[in-house]
């Protein structure tokens, strides 16, 4: 039917810009939760251990909640990688604080900044692949 194909064409034209925006926002989210970026954004001289830990965790969660609706526009596999990237960051940050109870805050900041986020990298690759298949 001609009407069905026209409807699909119009839907495609409406959805594609939203999908592209979702891809952009989720790549930006992954970039913003990279360890060195988080440390640079949150750390300042004189910050307490508790405030530093809380601020990093809160930043990751706030960024995630801000981008939650993007789930509508990406595949389930991409969304799962986004979730795993977020969890990887939260777990690593908590582990540094728990494993180094007597370390000074500068050492903790340096240690956190040196981490990599392989799940984040996988998520970005997945997003790029989805984008390229539009």
Describe the predicted segments one by one.
Residues 1-134:
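Conserved non-transmembrane functional hotspots
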């Amino acid at each position: 039917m001609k009407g069905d194909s026209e409807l699909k064409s119009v839907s495609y034209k409406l959805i594609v810009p939203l999908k592209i925006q979702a891809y952009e926002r989720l790549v930006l989210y992954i970039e913003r939760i990279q360890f060195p970026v988080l440390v640079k954004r949150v750390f300042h001289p004189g910050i307490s251990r508790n405030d530093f830990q809380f601020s990093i965790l809160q930043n990751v969660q706030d960024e995630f909640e801000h981008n939650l609706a993007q789930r509508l526009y990406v595949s389930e596999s991409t969304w799962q990688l986004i979730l795993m990237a977020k969890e990887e960051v939260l777990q690593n940050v908590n582990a540094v604080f728990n494993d180094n109870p007597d370390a000074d805050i500068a050492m903790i900041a340096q240690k956190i900044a040196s981490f990599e986020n392989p799940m984040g990298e996988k998520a970005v690759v997945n997003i790029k692949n989805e984008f390229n298949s539009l």
